[in-house]
Amino acid sequence: MLRPGRARAIVALLVMLMVMLASCAQIPRSGPVGKSKDEGAGNPNAPVFFPAAPRAGSSPETVIEDFYMAGSGYEDDYPVARQYLTQAQSVTWKPDKRAIVFREAQVVKAAGENEYLYELDLAYSVDADGVATQFPPGTKETIPVTLEQVEGEWRISKVPDGTAIPEETFKVIYGANPIYFYDPTFTYAVPDYRWFIKKNTVKSMTSALLAGPAPYLRGAVVSAFPSGMKLARESVPVVSGAAQVDLSAKELFDASAEDRQRMQNQLALTFRNQPDVINVQLRADQDLVRVEDNGTVLPPVLDKSVPARQIAVNNGDLVRYENNRVTPLPDIQSVAGLGPHSPAESPVSQTAAFLNGDKTTLYSIEPGQPARQLTTRTTLTGPSFSPNDWVWTAGPGATGAAEVVAYKPTGSAPGAGIPSVTMTPAWLTGRTVKDFRVSREGTRALVISEANGKSAVQVTGIVRNPDGVPKDLTVPITLLSNSAADQGAWVNGSTVAVMSGSATSTVVPELLSLESGEPQQLAPWDGLTSISVGNGAEQIYGQSDAGIFQRVGNGWELQLKGPTEPAFPG
């Protein structure tokens, strides 16, 4: 059985060795023109571990423990870890298939002869394309391991592909990196965060990009690279700051000039945080392919911003809240008789939407027109607009099952039917949707739902038909939160703010990131009942009975008393 003290000591020793090496062996950032880095180009200060080789006389339990500890020695294809395997198993074992990250581990004897189980408290699982799945404490996974004696020493003869490493080691060796895809109109860039070994980042990112988006984004985003395009060689060298991406020639030459420009833009965005990469070269069988920029392809918008104004409710009617002033919404008729709550405003038009007083009916309103009823249900989430003017809400359908509905009221003539779509995702079966917020580029949605008293914060992809009409929601990813969140808002393209609102309790909002599995708690504040976010974490607003507050540093500062439920466009 793995002794926790021994495991911590080994991890501490390895981390200390890594730090010492990093401080003594900085890779130069300058050199002769034309100097090439190999396919491992990425972080020049990437940590290197030197795990211990097998020791004579080790027990089966120790061999299993040490084998998985040796998974930190990734350079040159895990040579030390392979020493713990029989010759046959060493040849077939594929460590890059999966990385299992654990909080605690122990070896237990299984029923069969020379068979053992490596029991883990699972923290993450990372697949071959760097897609990470996070698990809450207490999630168990068991790895079966079989050993045999080779020249009097125990060696592993059967083990699944992949590595299993402690969470502390994982956070040192691996880093989260966004690879970028497009929204279906090629207007916006959408981040898809992957976890890669820091030493091999550029090549790993390129392979993952060619393989396509993570499961929760499939169908919601598009790539400039056609399906089936591959690297022509298993490396992406960086020469004098240029990442040389050598692709299969036929697919590259078959692509239009516009598509090649989009390919280059997509790679440039993906490599933008890599310190060695200044620009990108597309190559076909090692020959440079020139990409002409004739101005017809615009770079995609990264981290789409929202206007500085907010919509709010004041004296029972819809108003605009901007620069700490309240003004009427331009050319919008009064809706005071409907008791508006949870207002939302389109980011691209003057259309607004809101719920009635008991939050059972959704209305939309356009300049110069009366409010129009869109749907009535036993309960509804506050409306949220996408950048193509669809307004979304969620609530129980006729059978009680959770439904997500979208309407496009903008431009519909008075009295005419309003286009609408109803979706009943299987993954929402048995759940009550508390909040539904479309991301600013329109390809994803933040979904907060509850079942059996437990809330889940998830991000789903929005699948659309070619004409832009919503069609489906993908199976989501889950972001771990420390609170029983019931509402949230997008902070930027990779972060959301969530909280459990309460007029009578102290509320602690959290920032949850696609990049990091650790929630960031914001300063607590009494009585926060709603939250809104502009452009970035410095523009977070909370509302309580005392007024509207803005996050300032590690606290909250009163902005204005009177208006309630402020919301930025979207």
Curated annotation (Swiss-Prot):
One of its GO terms (cellular component) is plasma membrane. Its main location: membrane. It is a lipid-anchor. It is found in: Cell membrane. It holds the Pfam family Gmad1. Residues 1-23 form the signal peptide. A lipid is attached at residue 24 (N-palmitoyl cysteine). InterPro entries: GerMN, Lipoprotein_LpqB, Lipoprotein_LpqB_C, Quino_amine_DH_bsu. Keywords: Cell membrane, Lipoprotein, Membrane, Palmitate, Signal. A lipid is attached at residue 24 (S-diacylglycerol cysteine). The keyword Lipoprotein applies. SMART domains: Germane. Belongs to the LpqB lipoprotein family. This is Lipoprotein LpqB. The gene is lpqB.
